[in-house]
C-alpha cells in the first residue's frame, strides 16, 4: 500500500544552440607578421598573441523528462523501524542533432528509521554533451613553456657519456595545436551515494550528516596533453619510430652529429604538437563528506550558528589510454628514464587541483540587530605534476588556510528599515597562495586566491 501524496512532474524542451567565434583578421591568422630584418613569418599580427581561427557551430536539442515522487510509508502507518519511507524515480532523455541521443534514469530512497535518524541513498546515470567548441574548433594554437623534450635529453646524455639527469634537461616552449573532435560522443557517468542524517531530538537544531559517494565516468572529453605527446614521441623514437602528432623540423648538422653519437635517429626541434579533443578512458572518483550544524538560541546572548564541513577524496583514478600505457610500460621496463611520467593518468588524488582533504568551519552570532561571523577554510596540499625538484623529486604545493571575519548591524528604521551595514575582512591573516608551476599566475587559481587581506564595507537595503 502506498501512502497518500504521490507526486508527478513531466516536461519537454527544445533548444537551439549556436556558437560563433569571429576574431579580427590580425588575430585569426588571416594577416601574418613578417620580420623585415630576418624574414621570419609569425602567424599573428599582434605581439604576444597566438592565432585563433574563426570557429562556428550549431545544433538542435530535443529533451523530455519525467519524475515520480512516491511516499511508500507514512508516519501514521505504524510500521516498526520505518517511520517514513519515500522514493523518487526519474528519467531524462535528450536528442542532439550532432552527437546522438541519450536517456538516463535516477532512483533515490529516503528511509527514516526514527524521527531523529534518516538513511538516504541514490543511484543515477548522467550525461554531458561535448560543447560546440570541442566539436568544431579548428586548430587553436597556443605556445606552452616548461615542456621537456626527453629524446633530446637522452641524446645529450648518451653523447656526453653521462647518466640521464633531469636537472640537465632544459625546458622548451612548444606550440600546441588544439582542434575539435567531430566524432565525439556524450560523456556518460554512473553516480551512487549512501548517507545518513542524525538530528537528536534532545538537542535543538543539531544535525550530523555523513555521505559516501562514487562517480564513474566514461568518454570524458579532454586532451592527451602536449607533454604526454612529446613523452610518447620519446618512447617511440627509442624504438625506431616516432609520434606523428609531434611535428619536428629537419635536424641541423649539429643535431645530426649529436644523435648519431648517441646511437639514435636524428631529430630536429619541435615545431608544433597536435593535441585534438578526444574521448578519454574511464575515470573513477570516490569520497566521503562530513557535516555538523548546530543552532543555539539563548535568551540573553542571542543566536549562534556553528557549522563544520569536511570532504575527503578517497579515490580519483584515470584509466590510462593505450598511448599512456606505452609510456608507463617503457618506464617500468627501464627503456625510458624514470623521470618520464604521464600527468593526469592513473591515481590522481592530490595531483594538481585534487587535494585529499578540504574543510571549512564557521560561527555566526545575531542579537537585537547586531551580528558577527568568523569562518575558517582549509585546502590540503597537492602535487604539482608539471615541475620537479633539482633531484627529480615531486614538487609539493603546501596546504592553504584562510580566515574571514565580519561584523554588522541591521537598522530597524534608518532608510526606511531593514538596512544592514557590514564591515569585514577576508583573508584576515594576509596569507599568500602557495607557489605552483601549473599556471602562468604561479599558483592554482582553482584552489587558492592571490588576494591578500582586504577590508570591505557593505550596505544592503531590503524592500
Residue ranges, per PLM feature:
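Gram-negative outer-membrane beta-barrel transporters
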Residues: 80, 211-386
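Short loop/turn motifs that connect adjacent beta-strands in outer-membrane beta-barrel proteins
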Residues: 1-6, 73-85, 116, 152, ...
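Surface-exposed extracellular loop regions of Gram-negative outer-membrane beta-barrel proteins
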Residues: 8-17, 58-110, 189-193, 375-377
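Transmembrane beta-strands of outer-membrane beta-barrel pores
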Residues: 14-20, 72, 91-97, 123-129, ...
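Outer-membrane beta-barrel signature, preferentially recognizing the C-terminal barrel domain
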Residues: 130-208, 273-288, 352-357, 450-454
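Outer-membrane beta-barrel transmembrane domain signature of Gram-negative proteins
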Residues: 1-82, 320-353, 358
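Transmembrane beta-strands of outer-membrane beta-barrel proteins
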Residues: 6-10, 64, 83-89, 105, ...
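C-terminal beta-signal and adjacent terminal beta-strands/loops
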Residues: 216-219, 314, 375-386, 409-463
